[in-house]
Regions:
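Alpha-helical sensor/transducer elements of the RecA-like P-loop NTPase core
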Residues: 2-71, 75, 81-86, 168-172
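C-terminal boundary/linker of central alpha/beta nucleotide-binding cores
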Residues: 67, 98-178, 187-190
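Linker/hinge segments immediately adjacent to helix-turn-helix/homeobox DNA-binding domains
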Residues: 89-97, 499-525, 529-539, 544-637, ...
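Extended alpha-helical scaffolding segments used for macromolecular assembly and cargo binding
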Residues: 183-259, 265, 274-278
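Alpha-solenoid helical repeat architecture
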Residues: 203-204, 215-219, 254-257, 289-299, ...
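Amphipathic alpha-helical segments of tetratricopeptide repeats
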Residues: 227, 244-248, 280-288, 317-330, ...
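Internal alpha-solenoid helical repeat scaffolds
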Residues: 250-420, 426
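Recognition helix of helix-turn-helix DNA-binding domains
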Residues: 649-684
Length: 690
């Protein structure tokens, strides 16, 4: 804000400063306060009003009545391209498709229509493309210029010899293409797919081949960087399953690497059973493809043993004997382990073995990196840094995060690079180091720009928004995360390694909105998922989240049950950081005998952990905290004794007689116990002291 204010107050020296943003976020108030000094151009300013339409008509040499101009505005919403179309049609109004149909489509001959359909899958058209996509004889000699002269909503760049159809026109033409008879429609999609494939635009090549029902066309593409993509309503995982099941085996044999890449997509989409079936079948198809592809198969089949590092290492050892050069399957464009940005979430599978796993992971990935030219570079350092972080060893964690960043950048391992940014941000938030958090965010944004091969891809978007969204979740500012990470993002049907962490942020969003029941339902359903997705790290996070949710709804018994599970996992490796973030909320549960007796040492360590995480307290997640005092200390032996007798149904006088103390002393002990336990009535004692 200060920089913006300084720029606004600069002397008038002819320098124009332009801010372009889809969403100004927290700067909106700053710009609104500077309204008199800043010239705004909003989306609404680009629409034409009734008087603008009349002026537009006059510039074209015509006139309109106020009624005609008003009808055009109502029909088009003031969208300039649509208004221009209405004026070309002599003021006719109606739905956009209707206008386009009447204005030019019905006036085109069959050849011109076919030519436009063949070009409708491109937003930039060159003469070379026309020669390749439109068969000879479709247009008469010199018909190209006539075609575009008669077609509205096409911008021509004469110098560069390019045509740019407007989105309105493309939408209309693609709807006409969908209505075209099957053979011609498929042939149009097939030719477009070939052009996209030959020009290295794989995403659109696959889309076109899929619509053309051309499985060999799909297999002929370089199927890289497609995790998370959708083709119409079909996910890439579903597409992979369809192609592997229906494409003739004699065709599949010609594309061994593509078969393995489709199997990789199956595992990435968590279709574990289908992955196992197809890998068994493909092993036989690869028998005559040479040792290298059998080595690639062994590399990929290591996923069948995940998260068993010994099993994975044995598969890598088998691959090492077969591969003749670096892997073609595991390359930077396919981020390590489907773009998951947390190695701790992936590989922490057995409580009590967290640091042992770090050592074993280093050994296994050393072999893997030899075979893949450093595909997992930085992953082992990231895991170790995350392990230190959950133990509260933040300085050591930062060192590991920086090492992960340096190593992963050299090998272009985006998963570890983005994971390092996430870890540095988490550590900064836990220490209330906002300058450190800003450095982590800046680092993330710089890396997002430098990994050009991820730009514009679904997996790239998932990875960046995972880091950004997770940090915003810890900051209790989920409303600033990407829209697709909000709303119904807690659904489980599309849960994968790639998007798991961003979906956990949705739980924070639900807590902030006090939708505790929905959060409980989502988390408890997640616990029943495949253990490859729900690791020990994820399970501990979920147990802690359920304890918070039940605590928020006042169900202290259920909250204690889930906190007990969380502490049982956490104390085996002393990974207390996340629980410590909410220790203020958990103080009432820490006092319960069922918790204090089992986890006394863990509770003392959690209270002593050097975490200065203020966001949870400032956000006031739980309505129940609004009216209760903060817990200061545990119950004394006498307070516990009095409270337990009261919970058993005794009156104050009966307690006094039993313990041989005065009734006023009983009242004093109960008052202290109520304050320490965050309760205001005796009925809660039964649940708290069980």
């Amino acid at each position: 804000p200060q920089i913006i204010d300084a720029l606004v107050k600069r002397p008038a020296d002819g320098l124009h400063i332009i801010f372009i943003a889809q969403n100004l976020g927290r700067l909106r108030a700053v710009f609104e306060a500077l309204e008199g000094a800043v010239c705004f151009l909003r989306a609404g300013d680009l629409l034409l009003a009734q008087e603008d339409v009349c002026a537009f008509a006059r510039r074209r040499g015509g006139t309109l009545t106020a009624a005609q101009a008003g009808a055009i505005v109502r029909s088009t919403g003031g969208w300039p391209a649509a208004v221009a179309l209405c004026l070309e049609a002599d003021g006719a109004t109606g739905e956009m498709d209707e206008l386009l149909y009447r204005l030019f489509w019905m006036r085109m001959d069959a050849g011109q229509r076919t030519a436009l359909l063949r070009l409708s899958l491109f937003d930039c058209i060159t003469p070379d493309m026309i020669d390749r996509l439109v068969p000879p004889g479709t247009l008469p000699e010199g018909g190209r210029e006539e075609l575009f002269r008669r077609t509205p909503l096409v911008r021509q760049d004469a110098m560069r010899r390019r045509y740019y159809p407007h989105e309105l026109l493309l939408r209309f033409l693609r709807e006409r293409l969908a209505e075209t008879e099957g053979p011609l429609r498929r042939e149009i999609y097939r030719r477009a797919g070939q052009w996209y494939r030959d020009n290295g635009i794989t995403r659109w090549a696959v889309d076109c081949f899929f619509r053309a029902e051309d499985d060999e066309g799909i297999l002929s593409c370089r199927l890289v960087g497609l995790i998370g993509e959708c083709f119409g309503e079909t996910s890439y995982t579903a597409l992979a399953r369809m192609v592997l099941r229906r494409c003739p085996e004699e065709v599949q044999r010609r594309y061994p690497l593509s078969l393995l890449r489709l199997c990789y997509a199956l595992y990435g989409g968590c279709e574990f059973a289908e992955f196992a079936r197809q890998m068994t079948r493909i092993r036989e198809l690869l028998a005559d493809s040479g040792a290298h592809y059998l080595g690639e198969w062994e590399l990929l089949d290591a996923l069948a043993f995940f998260p068993d590092l010994d099993g994975m290492d044995a598969a890598y050892a088998r691959a090492e004997k077969l591969l003749t050069h670096d892997s073609e399957l595991f390359i930077p464009e396919e981020p390590f382990f489907f773009g998951c940005t947390s190695m701790w979430y992936l590989f922490y599978a057995e409580p009590g073995q967290m640091m042992t796993t770090a050592d074993r992971l280093a050994q296994v990935l050393k072999r893997y990196d030899r075979l893949t030219n450093g595909h997992a570079a930085g992953a082992e350092e990231l895991y170790r840094g995350e392990a230190y972080s959950v133990q509260g060893r933040f300085e050591e964690s930062d060192i590991q995060a920086y090492q992960a960043a340096f190593l992963s950048e050299q090998a272009h391992n985006a998963s570890a690079t983005y994971g390092a940014a996430l870890l540095l941000g988490i550590n900064a938030i836990y220490r209330s180091d906002m300058a450190g958090l800003q450095k982590a965010v800046d680092y993330l944004e710089n890396k997002a720009r430098s990994y050009a091969f991820l730009r514009g891809t679904a997996i790239g978007r998932y990875m960046v928004e995972t880091v950004r969204g997770y940090l915003l979740g810890l900051m209790m500012e989920t409303g600033r995360s990407a829209l697709w990470t909000q709303g119904g993002a807690d659904t489980l049907a599309d849960l994968t390694f790639t998007n798991f962490m961003i979906k956990t942020c949705r739980i924070t969003d639900l807590l902030l909105k006090k939708e505790y029941q929905r959060a409980i339902a989502s988390v408890e359903a997640s616990l029943a998922l495949d253990t490859r997705l729900i690791s020990a790290a994820a399970r501990n996070f979920m147990y802690c989240g359920l304890a918070l949710c039940y605590l928020a709804t006042g169900r202290l018994g259920k909250a204690a049950e889930w906190l007990n599970r969380s502490l049982t996992i956490a104390e085996q490796d002393k990974n207390y950081s996340f629980i410590a973030c909410f220790r203020k909320y958990f103080q009432a549960l820490f006092l319960m005998p069922s918790i204090a007796a089992r986890h006394g040492e863990a509770i003392r360590e959690i209270k002593a952990l050097a975490i200065h995480y203020t966001r949870a307290d400032e956000s006031r997640i739980f309505a129940m905290l609004d009216d209760v005092p903060e817990l200061k200390e545990a119950l004394t032996d006498r307070e516990r004794e009095v409270a337990q007798l009261a919970a058993g149904g005794m009156r104050n006088s009966e307690i006094a007689e039993t313990l041989h103390i005065s009734e006023n002393t009983v009242k004093h002990h109960l008052k202290n116990a109520f304050q320490k336990m965050n309760i205001d009535r005796r009925s809660r004692l039964i649940e708290m002291l069980r």
